């Protein structure tokens, strides 16, 4: 085992996608190959590579489970915004995977979870947009 414990933060990120690919390869008794980038895994999955498709399926399902757990933990009942460098590349996978099922599958809370929207932020610099909006609101002309 490369890591003694795998945190949510270590798993649901670009390097986590690569680590998951390597772990699933080793479990299957297959050689994970040389150095990989997250974009390699997503590109190979889009081309139909079964190992990469499986990696994305597992990644999206775990992502959904973690996002759902965070709603229950924080009470974010109005919605969850998915952000990060991987999100734009994963949109199709997220929509056609177990993401939403795992997000909603929370026992007696499942009906409430089904009403919580999940939205993807795909702008490359959402923080800059937010800062600009804040500047206009704070320092712009008052009407």
Name each model-derived stretch.
Residues 2-143:
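ATP-binding/phosphotransfer module of carbohydrate and carboxylate kinases, centering on a glycine-rich
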């Amino acid at each position: 085992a490369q890591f003694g414990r795998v945190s949510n933060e270590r798993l649901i990120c670009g390097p986590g996608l690569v680590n998951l690919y390597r772990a699933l390869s080793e479990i299957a008794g297959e050689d994970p190959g040389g150095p990989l980038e997250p974009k390699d895994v997503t590109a190979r999955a889009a081309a139909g590579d079964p190992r990469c498709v499986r990696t994305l399926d597992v990644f999206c399902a775990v992502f959904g489970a973690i996002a759902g757990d965070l709603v229950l933990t924080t009470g974010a009942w109005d919605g969850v915004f998915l952000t990060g460098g991987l999100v734009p590349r994963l949109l199709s996978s997220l929509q056609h995977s177990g993401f939403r099922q795992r997000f909603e599958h929370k026992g007696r809370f499942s009906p409430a979870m089904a009403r919580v929207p999940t939205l993807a932020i795909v702008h490359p610099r959402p923080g800059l947009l937010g800062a600009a909006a804040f500047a206009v609101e704070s320092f712009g002309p008052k009407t």
